[in-house]
Amino acid sequence: MKHILTGLLFILVCTVSFGQETYLSVGRNFTTYDFTNSSGESNLNVQNSSGASYEVGYAMKINPKLGLAIGVTLNQYNATGGDFVNNYSWDTNYLGAQGVLKFNVFKENSSRWGYNNSKFGLSLNAGLNVNHIINGQQKINGQTYDLTENDEFKGFYAQPMLGFDIRCQIINDIAVGLGYHYSKNFGLSNTTDQKLNFNNNQLQFNLIITLN
């Protein structure tokens, strides 16, 4: 995990030379496993859980109202479960590439809403993430199993998302912000009768650097 985070920070430094804005996001995923067995039945004993979220990348302006953010993500999609006899937990890490279109409802330093030098901005977002498990464990009553070769977890996932973020300019070239996205992560490679998708609510804290 430390090596992965170091790599994400390295990508952040590299994007300074290429993008109009570069950003770092950290947050929390609140995930529900959408699992069906070979009979098409869901497992009611699987409960939602939370995990960390990291993203680095850069954003480009397409026109005054529309922008594109391209980033690398590391997301944990976790769950717990069990009954009177057994206890389960799933802890996973997925590495992905993400593109998000951002529609600016209003931007900082604009005159909208009568504020001549507003420090606040709001954007509505729609995007797609393509990701793959890099490590994961399932624990059953103290026994640990590797999920990276499990048919339901391995392979590529496609994750469409919708959300919004707000930002506040704190000094000339630096802004901070908060974001929320809802997404569903669909498994693309699983050919078995058992299917697993992830429903995810994500909260993010964003640090944005404007490039000259």
Would you name each region that the model predicts?
Residues I4-C14:
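Sec-dependent N-terminal signal peptides
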Residues G19-K61, I208-N212:
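Short glycine/proline- and aromatic-enriched beta-strand/turn motifs that initiate or cap beta-hairpins
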Residues Q20, N48-A52, S89-A97, F120, ...:
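Residues that define the transmembrane beta-barrel architecture of outer-membrane proteins
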Residues T22, P64-L68, K107-S110, C168, ...:
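Repeated loop/turn-to-beta-strand initiation elements of outer-membrane beta-barrel proteins
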Residues R28, A59-G142, N201-N212:
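Gram-negative (and chloroplast) outer-membrane scaffold detector with strong preference
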Residues D34-E41, T80-N86, I134-T144, S189-K195:
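Outer-membrane beta-barrel translocator domains and adjoining extracellular loop/strand segments
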Residues E41-N45, N86-Y88, W113, E149-K154, ...:
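Outer-membrane beta-barrel domain signature
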Residues Q76-G81, Y157-N212:
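Predominantly the C-terminal beta-signal and adjacent terminal strand-loop region
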